[in-house]
Amino acid sequence: MAKIKIELVKSPIGYKYDQRDTLKALGLRKVHDVVIQPDIPQIRGMINKVRHLVLVKALEEEE
C-alpha cells in the first residue's frame, strides 16, 4: 500500500475547531511535525480539509 508523508507547516491557531481536530486525528500536534499515513480515501479527505496548513509528499514503495 502506498504511503504519504504529511508535515504541518502552518499553525492552526485562529482556525476552526474542526480543522484543529482533523490535525489531531492525523497525528499532527506542533508545527513541523511529520507523520507517515497510508494513502487511502479517508486520509486524503482529512488532508483536503486542512490543505492550507499541511505539506503532502508521496513516498516511494519499498519492497
From Swiss-Prot:
GO molecular-function terms, A-Z: structural constituent of ribosome
GO biological process: translation
Organism for this UniProt entry: Pseudothermotoga lettingae (strain ATCC BAA-301 / DSM 14385 / NBRC 107922 / TMO)
Assembly with partners or alone: Part of the 50S ribosomal subunit.
Family per record: Belongs to the universal ribosomal protein uL30 family.
Keywords noted in UniProt: Ribonucleoprotein, Ribosomal protein
Protein name, as recorded: Large ribosomal subunit protein uL30
Keyword Aminoacyl-tRNA synthetase (UniProt): no
One Gene Ontology CC term in the entry: cytosolic large ribosomal subunit
